[in-house]
Every structure is written in structure tokens, then in C-alpha cells.
Amino acid sequence: MLRPVDRQDSRFLRDMLRHAYHWRLAQDPELPVYRYVKNWGRRGDAGVVAFEGPNAYGAAWYRLFPASEPGFGFVDEETPELTIAVVPSRRGHGSGAELLEALLVRARSDGFEQLSLSAEPGQTGFYEKHRFRELARKDGTVTMVASL
């Protein structure tokens, strides 16, 4: 099942960052990647959490960034940037697709024209299946956008 992300989910979103980036993050809240969840609940923040019973196992969310502090997949100040992660034991069963599609619907209903993301080269196939296309390559990553 899915439900909207709320302020109480900020710790879970931080945990999901570790899965999204496929490498261990130190517990340093000043690392650049934590900008995706720091002070969750500001204007432009939205997301969905996948859960079964009391256990959450995945999340997809987006956040707007200012040009002065861009995210890794920054396009412009009007395009929210997507982050998505599912715990390893639940991957390959459609949870990511369900989360992503729900978030695309939410972004469209919130009036956004597109979403962006940053992916590693060779890790773009999932996003391409969900309307994302490559926009640019920089710093060893691929910036992708999906029109809504």
C-alpha cells in the first residue's frame, strides 16, 4: 500500500537515501546528499511511502532546489528533483514502479510540468520505462527529465 510522506517520515527518508545511492553514507547530516531530506516539509516537498502492515519498505519523493544550492539532477527552480528507493528484499516486484507512477501523478496534480533526477550511467533503464529521458551528463552522472 501507499500513503503520502509526512514530517514524521524524515528519518525513514534518510534511511532510504542509503538505498538510493547504493553506498554507505556516514551519519554526517552535512553531507551534500542529505539536502534531499533536510528540513522535510518545506514548499515543494512531496512523496509517497510504500508499506505493508507497520513496516515501510520504500519511498519516492521530490523536492525543489534553488539555483544557489542545486541538487545533483538540478534543471531549474521550477522542476522538482526525484529520489526513489526500495529496500533490497522488496526489489524486483514492482514496488519501485508503483511508487514512481504515484509520484508522477502527484507532481502533475501539484501543477509541475516535469520532474528531474540524477542517475549513474548504466542505471537509467528503469527511468526510461517511466517516461524519463536523458537531458545531460555531468560529473559522471546522467540528468534525466520526465514531462508530465
Region annotations inferred by a language model:
Residues 107-119:
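Conserved GNAT acetyl-CoA-binding A-motif
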Residues 86, 92-105, 109, 128-129:
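Conserved acetyl-CoA-binding loop-helix of GNAT-fold acetyltransferases
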Residues 45-47, 59, 139-143:
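Short hydrophobic/aromatic beta-strand or adjacent loop that forms the aromatic wall/cage
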Residues 1-15:
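A short beta-loop-alpha structural element at the N-terminal edge
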Residues 24-53:
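Active-site rim helix/loop that mediates acceptor-substrate recognition in acyltransferases
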Residues 5, 84-86:
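Hydrophobic adenine-recognition pocket in adenosine-nucleotide-binding enzymes
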Residues 97, 109, 121-143:
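Conserved active-site alpha-helix within GNAT-family acetyltransferase domains
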Residues 51-84, 91:
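Conserved acyl-donor/pantetheine-binding loop and adjacent beta-alpha core of acyl/acetyltransferases
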